[in-house]
Amino acid sequence: MTEVAGRPGTSGGLALRAGQFVFAAASICAMASAPGFTNYTAFCYLVASMGLQALWSLGLGCLDYYALTLRRDLQQALLMSLFVVGDCVTAILSFAAACSAAGVVVLFERDAYLCRRDPQLPCGRFEVAAAFAFLCWTFSAASALVMSWLLASL
């Protein structure tokens, strides 16, 4: 049971963390390049959530790299408990932020037609940021699932 792909201290775990970080950073960059995103709460929440996700995944990615370099085992009950809680919290926050941002984008484009009426509104960038947030969430959810599975098998 302990040989699950993506467990901490392995190259699979490092790849999951790298994917989380890359897509969170891409979402932040896409949103930050959109002028006026601070006028909408859902987009500010997306940036805050992706910032937290990027910091969490960067920290655990560094820990995975350290464990890989020194061949350390990170499967200890206390560490796994912290990983599970952190991964579950960041996965839930990422999903909520991605859904809220995507909901506002749908409102702008399909319901209120604000994107057609106001060509200055960067709807395409909002869409890209929400899409990257969903991709970040998929990596985060996979990591949370792996960590929960590993904690249950200890």
Curated annotation (Swiss-Prot):
Pfam families in the record: CASP_dom (PF04535)
Membrane topology qualifier: Multi-pass membrane protein
GO cellular component, one term: plasma membrane
Name of the protein this chain belongs to: CASP-like protein 5B1
Family label: Belongs to the Casparian strip membrane proteins (CASP) family.
Keyword list, A-Z: Cell membrane, Glycoprotein, Membrane, Transmembrane, Transmembrane helix
Glycan attachment positions: N39
InterPro entries: CASP_dom, CASPL-5
Cytoplasmic side: 1-17, 64-87, 152-154
Localization per record: Cell membrane
Main location per the UniProt record: membrane
Spans through the membrane: 18-38, 43-63, 88-108, 131-151
Stretches assigned to the Extracellular side: 39-42, 109-130
Subunit structure: Homodimer and heterodimers.
